[in-house]
Amino acid sequence: TASVLLLVALIAVGMNITYALFSPTKLEKPGKCPKNPPRSIGTCVELCSGDQSCPNIQKCCSNGCGHVCKSPVF
C-alpha cells in the first residue's frame, strides 16, 4: 500500500508540473506573496500551479518547500 500511495503522489506531482509548464495562459494576480517566517519549511506538496489556480485574490506562493494559495500583500 505504501508503494501505491507513493506512485499516486508522484503521478499527481508530475501532472501539476506538466500543467504548470504547458498551461496556455499564466495569470498573475496583483500583489506579492507574503514572506515566509525565517527558518520555516512548509509542507512539501504542490497545492497550486500558478495564481490562476487560486480562488479570489489569492496567489500561488512558495511555503518553503511546496506551493499553496495565500492572501497577497500590497
From Swiss-Prot:
Q: Where in the cell is it found?
A: Secreted
Gene Ontology cellular-component annotations: extracellular space
Recall the GO molecular function terms of this protein's record: serine-type endopeptidase inhibitor activity
WAP domain location is 26-73
* Entry keywords, A to Z: Protease inhibitor, Secreted, Signal
Q: Which residues form the signal peptide?
A: 1-23
Q: Which GO terms describe its biological process?
A: antibacterial humoral response; innate immune response
Main localization of the protein described in the UniProt heading: secreted
Tissue distribution is:
Spleen, kidney, brain, liver, lung and cell line Rat-2.
Cysteine disulfide partners in this protein: none
Q: Which PANTHER family match?
A: ACTIVATED MACROPHAGE_MICROGLIA WAP DOMAIN PROTEIN, WHEY ACDIC PROTEIN WAP
What this chain does, per the entry, is described as: Involved in the metastatic potential of adenocarcinomas in rat. Could have proteinase inhibiting capacity.
User: Could you identify this protein by its name?
Assistant: WAP four-disulfide core domain protein 18
Q: Tell me the organism.
A: Rattus norvegicus
